[in-house]
């Protein structure tokens, strides 16, 4: 995590206890061991003075001891937890029991000792479980924050040109909403959105980040010389305190199928810091749902499950697990992209209003479905994608993950039915999608579909936490049977047309390239080099 400058850390801690598990560093600390508790005799544990690096951790605060002369080498690492024994000794010293060591820390100043005492007290007097902790398994949270603590993962998102450029355009295109305003960046990651807010004229940005990425965000802030504008605060928005209300909240809280990772609840929770009539970027999200037909995808998953249908695999009968194998494969949502022509009806749109919806509204999301079928075929399941809108004072900007829009790192998601249903053009397909939040920062997705006027129905429950990432980078193929004329003749007609243009071009001094294109006449450059 980021280590704030001592003066900044003191200011934040004194003003409003910005983070209950503050991140800071202390230089010039002399560390002694208690050699004899009866006589209170001390011996220096390390040669010379040390620097203490305190960093946020889900269990408390990690205390790293490094030499003042060589900070690249960690001498010792301790964990300050709620049950850590500690006590003040005079004005500049602090006694603390860490692991098997009974230590006395003598700080360079009274202010440093007071700040360290506050760090310890904040850990020892942790608030009751936050909303985030109540809804999230500890193992899931640990894995989640570890994942987003990697620079490579931040790079993956930042290099999503559609995502990053749309955010920048939405913010800079509505500079009136940011000029001289106080901004909160929720789940800031590398801090890229905070930088966009500063580019738009923000007076102050509080960048909240709970993963180790906070330390890299702080480095970027300092190297770009905007530390007077951006304050990186390590911690969860559900647990930290801000010194003031904000005018705008910015965040990128969308997951697969919009709701995965349950970051949207954190985004809505952040509204407690939003001033009346404040702005949220993005402002609302639309989840689109449509029935699709894709025999290739269905067969692919079905055939995988048939591995367990072997009765003599190296002499072992696997068939008893075939049913469970089938269930497991069809519980996986498919993350990839597709040609929208596989969709059999216009998509149903479910809206999430980030300005007004409550966190509780996202615990159980029930979406009624009614599709008027446009083409006869086999419905293999439902396809999902989302759009979000940035409603600004100057302009509205949309970020889309539709199969008709440029591809993003969210792709699209498809949920298969183990038992597909045949449906005809003109029929009505009704049903419901139920998204039930779980403590693994995801949802259990239940699909129920029924053809009106018949007894035909199909259903499935999927685990959004465990998707199958199918995207390979290959071009999206058109659905079978969509060609209305001979593709071969169409191609040769195009070549013939191109050839006619080439002939005309050659008469006008152009050069044919590979027989199908026009090149620039470079003979002049070859004969008369500069």
From Swiss-Prot:
Modification after translation: The dimethylated protein is the major form.
Record's function text: Methylates (mono- and asymmetric dimethylation) the guanidino nitrogens of arginyl residues in proteins. May methylate histone H3 at 'Arg-17' and activate transcription via chromatin remodeling. Coordinates ecdysone-mediated expression of cell death genes.
Residue stretches making up the SAM-dependent MTase PRMT-type domain: 141-450
Protein name according to UniProt: Probable histone-arginine methyltransferase CARMER
Subcellular localization, as worded in the UniProt entry: Cytoplasm; Nucleus
Residue positions where Asymmetric dimethylarginine is found in the record: 501
Keyword match Glycoprotein: no
InterPro entries listed in its UniProt record: Arg_MeTrfase, PH-like_dom_sf, PRMT_dom, SAM-dependent_MTases_sf
UniProt KW Transmembrane helix keyword: no
PROSITE patterns: SAM_MT_PRMT (PS51678)
Residues reported in the UniProt entry to bind S-adenosyl-L-methionine: 154, 163, 187, 209, 238, 266
EC number assigned by the record: 2.1.1.319
